[in-house]
Amino acid sequence: MNRRILSTVEELDSILRELDSVAETSDDELRRLFMTFSMEYPVNAEKDPYSHEYKTAQSALYERLSGKPYTPANEESAFDVGEAVFQPFPYLTKSPRTVGNHIIAVGNVIRHIQSPPPSTILEFGPGWGNTTLMLARMGYQVTAVDIEKRFIELIQKRAAQKSVEIECIHGDFSFISDTSRKWDTILFFECFHHCFEHQELISWLDGVVNEGGQVIFAAEPITDLFPVPWGFRLDGESLRAIRKFGWCELGFQEGYFRDLLHRHGWSVKRTDFTDTPVGTVFTATRLSDQNSGRTPTSLEGSEASRSKCQ
């Protein structure tokens, strides 16, 4: 498939107008068209991913693409809560492929949770609440934190439908920066890449995870194929999300991601599951917990280890 390399936001706007009309009729066709265009990274990018200059350059790139400065308040999603109660994503797409891939991915995430119910789970960015509801129905004590009020309202209504309890908190990733609470599992499922201040977020994790606990990063764009250590993704789908909605759409090189976690005392294991395009899971456990034998689960391993679920 030939891919068009865009160089201006005017070119991007022209394509997005075409995509808007396609989105009204076919989710599958929309996703296919995402693969037909992208942008390229500047060749003279700042090299140190922990430097102020690097972060400033990424902020400037975002402003160029979105037309405004980034703030977590940009992460809003407009939808009808009443309709979504009965037909949330992925069902609203009416795409067998999209629905199937999502359901498989959710199941893959759940089987990586090492502590059985009624242990505690903090889920960031639960969105439509599909994983949240499944965990609550299993008997987990789930805390769901989302910056979008409509998602919080949706999860509350869906929980009431199933007669399950879910603690819903309207907030952003900084919620864990000043809480005294701890959880057995922290879950990021397709949401960690929405955190521009991700280095700060990683520094907070140690204070909110119980001994022997874990942090799960599922279906996140973490790959050494990414052209820079971390930054805004410039593929078609990400460009649309940044330009049209103002969302933060980061990508990460795996080496950088592992180094960042290791700097804060975490070991990382990668598990690939190829039956869905969003099947890769990174599980972080404390180095100190591993050394003391406090992580009894078959899914764990050394920092550099990788495995495949069959």
Language-model segment annotations:
Residues 118-127:
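Conserved class I S-adenosyl-L-methionine
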Residues 187:
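A conserved beta-strand element that flanks and buttresses the S-adenosyl-L-methionine
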Residues 97-117:
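Conserved alpha-helix/loop element of class I SAM-dependent methyltransferases that forms part
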Residues 218-274:
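C-terminal alpha-helical "lid/dimerization" subdomain adjacent to the S-adenosyl-L-methionine
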Residues 190-191:
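Short catalytic micro-motifs in class I SAM-dependent methyltransferases
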Residues 128-175:
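Class I SAM-dependent methyltransferase SAM/SAH-binding core
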Residues 1-104, 231-244, 281-310:
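N-terminal accessory regions of S-adenosyl-L-methionine
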Residues 199-211:
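A short glycine-rich, Lys/Arg-flanked "PGG" loop and its adjoining helix->strand segment in the class I
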